Amino acid sequence: MMLIKFIKMIPKIIHYCWLSSDPIPADLLSCMESWKKFLPDYEFMLWNFERFPKDKSKWVRDAFDNKKYAFAADYIRIYALYHYGGFYLDMDVEVVKPFD
């Protein structure tokens, strides 16, 4: 019961990162389709370098320049959750039932 109350306090936003100029692979797009299927009332926020420019944070720029892409994504993920709330999903997560 407490978990349900807690989830209701969290904004219905799903954050995810794609820090590449390459197209998103089909297997990841398939996982993301499951999000839309089971979470139709959620907003989906893609975090890329258009939404969060590398130069917005020296730490992100340094991490990316040193090919520490996961470190850059970690920073952006925490930024997104702190400023907007919601949930973060890696793009290879398949949702199999609604969160509520």
Where are these predicted regions, by residue range?
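Short, solvent-exposed coil/turn linker segments
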Residues: 48, 62, 98-100
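Extended aliphatic helical segments
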Residues: 13, 60, 93-96
